[in-house]
């Protein structure tokens, strides 16, 4: 069988340098898992998401005509090279790999997505917890994407079903996800299917999934001695704490 050109040193021979790069990427992934070894499952999941989003960005230069290769693979996430980036498949495979190394039950699914980065054919993850299943779209949780402030990671849909697809709410838009035939065939369409998204809030290790981060939208002192601060509401937040740095 011919070797894909980006991995080949000949038509049927794998480039030894690429093999070493893959080994180094795998070791880097194991180091991330080791770094979060003492954390709870919920903290690991958030940590893995943040690490992946720190290590890579969405590859906007990839087109349908490009050869299937590294931008679709997890190597470009863990290779330590800031210039190598991935599409949704790379984000999803990287998250799946970290979960597999941590014995966290996670699945990778495919379908269509409307309203976010990589709109169209899409790959994302589903995380299992106590027999319930939760969205984990790492691609659209990255900085600059529709879900960077929450809504698409360990969140529940506002409406939908396996057959019709699910709608998730973010601060800026509602995002639609629909499973493809392959996902439905592989995992089934009944209420015991991993494709069935729960309405119960994610909670593990006595920790509820943390609210999305907020951001300051305005600061004013029009009234003497009175500082007024406004901020975006964070989904699932019970309250807010404000800290002032002195000096």
Model regions: which residues?
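Intrinsically disordered, low-complexity N-terminal segments that are enriched in acidic
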Residues: 1-4
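Pro/Thr/Ser/Gly-rich low-complexity, intrinsically disordered linker/stalk tracts
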Residues: 209-238
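Secondary-structure boundary elements
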Residues: 14-80
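Short beta-strand elements bearing conserved aromatic residues within extracellular beta-rich modules
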Residues: 240-244
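Loop/turn elements at helix/coil->beta-strand transitions in domains of secreted/extracellular proteins
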Residues: 40-46, 54, 83, 100-107, ...
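Hydrophobic/aromatic-rich core segments of domains that either
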Residues: 90-169
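Solvent-exposed strand-loop boundary residues in beta-sheet-rich modules
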Residues: 131, 246-247
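Low-complexity, Gly/Ser/Thr/Pro-rich intrinsically disordered linker/tail segments
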Residues: 147-212
